[in-house]
């Protein structure tokens, strides 16, 4: 799909062994970057994705900032530990008798940006200093 001069290639995967081919296709299509959405499957296989994108020199962007600490290029979104704390509070309320049907849905209110400059250097990418100064975490 083309949006504002960019072409978005969307690939759904349902099993771990399906992760590699879309990354290879991104390289073959000279994709500018790979945006890895937050899903249990992709999170479980994040190390596979990180290794493969690094080997192919594809910039990788994740929905969890922690992924940049694990070797991904960039992560932007709620911190996983904050999400788990909120989930824990909701579970305690439900176990304490609150009805799940009447329980409000809590959206993250705090987002973080993590940039891995080491990964950027390894794949030959320069990150603009104007972006780096806004990062919550910079991995060098």
Predicted regions and their residues:
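Short hydrophobic alpha-helices and adjacent helix-cap/hinge residues
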Residues: 1-140
């Amino acid at each position: 799909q083309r949006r504002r001069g960019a072409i978005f290639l969307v690939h759904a995967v349902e099993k771990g062994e399906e992760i590699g081919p879309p990354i290879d296709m991104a390289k073959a299509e000279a994709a500018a970057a790979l945006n890895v959405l937050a899903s249990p499957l992709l999170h479980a296989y994040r190390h596979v994705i990180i290794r493969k994108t690094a080997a192919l020199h594809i910039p990788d962007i994740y929905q969890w900032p922690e992924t940049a600490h694990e070797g991904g290029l960039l992560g932007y979104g709620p911190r996983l530990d904050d999400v788990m704390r909120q989930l824990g509070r909701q579970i305690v309320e439900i176990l304490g008798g609150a009805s799940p049907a009447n329980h409000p849905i809590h959206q993250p209110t705090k987002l973080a940006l993590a940039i891995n400059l080491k990964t950027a250097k390894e794949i030959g990418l320069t990150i603009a200093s104007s972006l780096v100064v806004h990062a919550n975490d910079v991995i060098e």
